[in-house]
Regions:
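Enzymes that bind and transform nitrogen-containing heteroaromatic metabolites
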Residues: 2-8, 13-17, 22-24, 63, ...
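A broad detector of short, well-ordered amphipathic alpha-helices
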Residues: 8, 12-15, 39, 50-53, ...
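A short, flexible N-terminal coil/short beta segment enriched in small residues
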Residues: 10-14, 23, 34-41, 130-143, ...
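Proteins enriched for Cys/Gly/acidic motifs involved in redox and nucleic-acid/cofactor modification
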Residues: 19-23, 112, 126-154
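Helix-turn-helix
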Residues: 28
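Zn2+-dependent cytidine deaminase-like catalytic core
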Residues: 31-130, 215, 241, 246-248, ...
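Short alpha-helix boundary/capping motifs
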Residues: 59, 116-117, 142-144, 309, ...
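Generic structural signal for helix capping and beta-alpha/helix-loop junctions
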Residues: 105-106, 132, 298, 320
């Protein structure tokens, strides 16, 4: 096996931490000595041992003189765990092969520099593209302090998310819906508008056995979420945040008694200020959000510049209907040249349905972001 093959194995190990390590990155390691794999590990849970220490602890023989393959630059600072560079030095590792550089300002090349200063041979950027993609959520969060937001919706081939009567169950098949459940496990938060609560009364949990429920975030400008809705009735079991502009303490108290948290935010164009909401959620270490909103919230999110990714699940069906809902509504753009453009698109077939996943490319920094930086 060569460097790339060992790094691919490290990537597969890293993915085992998906959904459990946030706001930390997913990291995998392989220890190789004289052409034999003698140890492997991954970062399993936030707050627990890092991948390097797990891999070294698993070694079946002395790792002195071995090569360590790691998907992300080893850390060199104290956090919930001690620096991984110390463990590498103590183990007598001869060579370290790194996939991604760590953009965390506390690391940012310092880990590699320390290893080289101690005479360790370091090879960088092996399968860098794949390693970077693995931690795109972490890279965004650690550099902006705001959650990575993925706008997710299911629609027909004529662009409808419901029929003209409002019926939407089900647009996609079981395989695609199970894929969505895995996304709910992966993302730290899930966000909808009050319109979705009023129309569908969803539970917004992860239905994968052993999966992690995301923090539920309801954008509800005037606190119209019914106290008998599923999200309120289960708020003591699943963390639930109501983001609102309503400052009425009596209204807020009813939700708080049910177990909901209230975030009272500024109003922006008649709705909750989404940029302010992202800043608050980022401070609470919510590093990623699956946006399952309706057309109004989705447009507001795009207009606010908070969306990094779009996940469109497309079913080979046609609904028609001039009044049938679309995934993105709002004011819209006036001309084709003003469109929000998508890049790095990926297509995946899920049973009879298709997932198109793309990154949002903003032509320039949105005005809302510019104002927030002043």
């Amino acid at each position: 096996m060569n460097d790339k093959e060992y790094m691919r194995l490290a990537l597969q190990l890293a993915k085992k931490g998906c959904g459990w390590t946030s706001p930390n990155p997913m990291v995998g390691d392989v220890v190789v000595k004289e052409g034999r794999i003698i140890g492997q590990g991954w970062h399993q849970r936030y707050g627990q041992a890092h991948a390097e220490r797990n891999a070294l602890a698993s070694c079946t023989e002395d790792p002195q003189g071995a090569t360590l393959y790691v998907t992300l630059e080893p850390c060199c600072h104290y956090g919930k765990q001690p620096p991984c560079v110390d463990a590498i030095l103590d183990a007598g590792i001869h060579r370290v092969v790194v996939g991604s550089a760590d953009p965390n300002p506390l690391v940012a090349g310092k880990g590699i520099a320390i290893l080289r200063a101690h005479g360790i041979d370091v090879t960088e950027n092996v399968l860098q593209e794949e390693c970077d993609a693995l931690n795109k959520v972490f890279f965004h969060y650690i550099t902006t302090k705001r959650p990575f937001v993925s706008m997710k919706y299911a629609m027909t081939m004529d662009g409808k998310i419901a029929t003209y009567t409002g019926a939407s169950k089900w647009i996609t098949g079981e395989i695609a819906r199970n894929h969505v459940q895995r996304q709910r496990h992966r993302f730290r938060g899930i966000m909808v508008g009050v319109g979705t609560i009023l129309a569908d009364d969803p539970l917004l949990t992860c239905r994968i056995e052993g999966g992690r429920d995301p923090v539920r975030i309801i954008c509800d400008t005037h606190l119209r979420t019914p106290l008998q809705s599923q999200v309120v009735m289960t708020a003591k079991q699943v963390p639930t945040i109501l983001a609102t502009c309503c400052g009425d303490p009596e209204k807020q108290a009813a939700y708080q008694q049910a177990g909901c948290r209230i975030l009272c935010l500024e109003e922006h164009c008649g709705h909750v200020n989404l940029l302010q909401l992202m800043e608050q959620l980022g401070q609470e270490q919510i590093d990623s959000i699956l946006l399952e909103g309706g057309g109004t919230l989705n447009w507001s999110a795009l207009e606010s510049g908070i969306v990094q990714q779009v996940q469109a699940y497309i079913a080979p069906k046609l609904f028609g209907g001039r009044d049938a809902k679309a995934p993105i509504e709002g004011a819209g753009v006036p001309l084709p040249d003003a469109a929000f453009r998508l890049k790095n698109s990926r297509l995946e077939q899920l049973g009879k349905d298709f997932l198109i996943e793309s990154e949002v490319e903003y032509p320039c920094l949105p005005e809302s972001w510019k104002k927030s930086e002043q």
